A protein has these predicted regions:
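Phosphate- and other anionic-substrate recognition elements at nucleic-acid/protein interfaces
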Residues: 2-188
Length: 188
C-alpha cells in the first residue's frame, strides 16, 4: 500500500500466513529493494510475487498527496523490477474492495474489509484468536494502519484479483488494437 511518504506492507507465504509486516519510510523500502531484498530477516526470493496497490481513475480531483503516492509506487516498482528476482503485479483499491466485499458501494468498506480479514485468520476463534494479545499473539498481532490495506491486497490477490487484473489487461489490449486499427484505416 504505497503512500506519499510511508508504505504499509505485508509479507505472506504461499498459504497466506503473515510472515512479517510493517509501515516504513518509502526511502527505506527503496533501499531494501535495491540492496538486498532482506527486511528483518524475511527475504524475497527469486520467483516471489509482489502485488502493489495502485490508484485507478475515480472521476474526482486528485491531491498532491495522491500524486506523491503514485510517484513512490512507480519508484518502488522500478527498483523491484531492476532486481530481476520477483514478478510485480498491481491491483486497484476498487478491485480489492470488489473481490473482498463482493460488490461496489458498500458503506464503510475499510471497516468491513478489516472484519473480513480478521474472520479469515481467526480459525473459528474470533477477533481475539486472529489478533491475540502480547502474551498470546495471533497471526495478525501487531498489524495496524496501512498494513491492513496491504494485507487486503494480498488476500484479494489470492482470492480473485489476479483474474480481474487479467481481464483489465485484456480490455486495454483490445482498446489499443482497435485504436491502432482505426489509425491505420484513417491513414490509408
Amino acid at each position: 500500500d504505497p503512500g506519499s511518504s510511508l508504505t504499509g506492507w505485508v509479507l505472506v507465504d504461499d498459504d497466506g500466513a503473515v510472515l512479517a509486516h510493517g509501515k516504513d519510510p518509502n526511502e527505506q523500502l527503496l533501499a531494501w529493494y535495491r540492496e538486498s531484498l532482506v527486511h528483518d530477516e524475511e527475504t524475497l526470493d527469486r520467483g516471489d510475487l509482489v502485488v502493489l496497490e495502485f490508484m485507478s481513475p475515480r472521476g474526482m480531483s486528485t491531491s498532491e498527496h495522491e500524486f506523491d503516492a503514485l510517484w513512490w509506487a512507480g519508484r518502488l516498482t522500478e527498483a523491484l523490477e531492476a532486481t530481476g528476482l520477483v514478478t510485480i503485479e498491481r491491483v486497484s483499491r476498487e478491485e480489492v474492495k470488489f473481490v473482498l466485499l463482493g460488490k461496489h458501494g458498500v458503506p464503510q468498506p475499510d471497516a468491513r474489509i478489516r472484519s473480513i480479514l480478521i474472520d479469515r485468520y481467526a480459525a473459528g476463534g474470533g477477533k481475539e484468536a486472529a489478533i491475540g494479545t502480547k502474551a498470546h499473539p495471533g497471526p495478525l498481532y501487531g498489524v495496524k494502519a496501512d498494513e491492513w490495506a496491504a494485507l487486503a491486497v494480498a488476500c484479494a490477490w489470492r482470492d480473485d484479483a489476479r483474474d480481474i487484473v487479467q481481464e483489465r489487461a485484456e480490455r486495454a489490449e483490445k482498446k489499443r488494437a482497435e485504436a491502432e486499427r482505426r489509425s491505420r484505416k484513417a491513414a490509408a
